[in-house]
Amino acid sequence: MRFNRIFLLLLCVTLCFCGCQKTNTLPHVNDTKETGLLDELIFLGDSTTAHMQQRAAVAPSQIWATRNRYYNLDSRVTYTKILLPETGEELTVAEAAARKKPPFLIITLGIDYGVYYYRNDLDKFRLYYEKLLDVIKEASPDTVLVLQSIFPVARESATITNEMIDRANEVIAAIAEERGLIYVDASTPLKDNAGYLKPSYCSSSDGIHLTAAAYDAVLKNLACYEQRIKEKGS
């Protein structure tokens, strides 16, 4: 009888320990066999996109970013090289698009350089943005391009303002409309009532970079456009 009580006690302890271990283990984004649209998306962008590799529920192979994580929207936008996640090769975006032929490419670009430096010359902002779109389309005509708005900044941002970002986003939205592309407003869901990036969504003292919770909000917002994105790809 005493032996049975000891055995049951040990069994309970073992089960509790295993249960705790299981609860603390987070599943990887690709652990499930069933995959939805999210698994087909490639995200291209500057530092706010690069940080998705560590903070968003997507596979690292879905992120196209530069080695130093900065991707300037300037005269060299088509020459800048990104790291191809699968091989570690450095390729231009056009070269990567020609090789991988991604079905869907989500572009979020402008915060690292364009928004501030072309704040008084949005025609130049548009010029470089469209140059990038042109080379991608030439390299991979069947890739569905989705233009996502630049994310807002928090109060801590010293140089870039949300007014600058809003004006740049108006340009991006206009480009999308003129080209028949999908424009995703990711800015509004991230803003507080005063128009700043919500404090809980800001991970850096510069007021620019996002937390894991912010990326969750970005992906949930993107899911609202899923039907339209799928229709473009059909």
Language model regions located:
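Generic structural signal for well-ordered alpha-helices
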Residues: 129-134, 169
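Active-site segments of SGNH/GDSL-like serine hydrolases
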Residues: 108-112, 136-166
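Conserved SGNH/GDSL esterase-like catalytic core that processes O-acyl groups on lipids
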Residues: 34-127
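N-terminal secretory targeting modules
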Residues: 1-44, 48-54, 229-234
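Extracellular/periplasmic envelope-modification machinery, especially enzymes
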Residues: 19-29, 56, 60-73, 80, ...
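A structural signal for isolated positions on well-ordered beta-strands in alpha/beta enzyme cores
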Residues: 42, 106, 144-146, 182
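Catalytic His-Asp segment of secreted/periplasmic serine-dependent ester chemistry enzymes
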Residues: 152-234
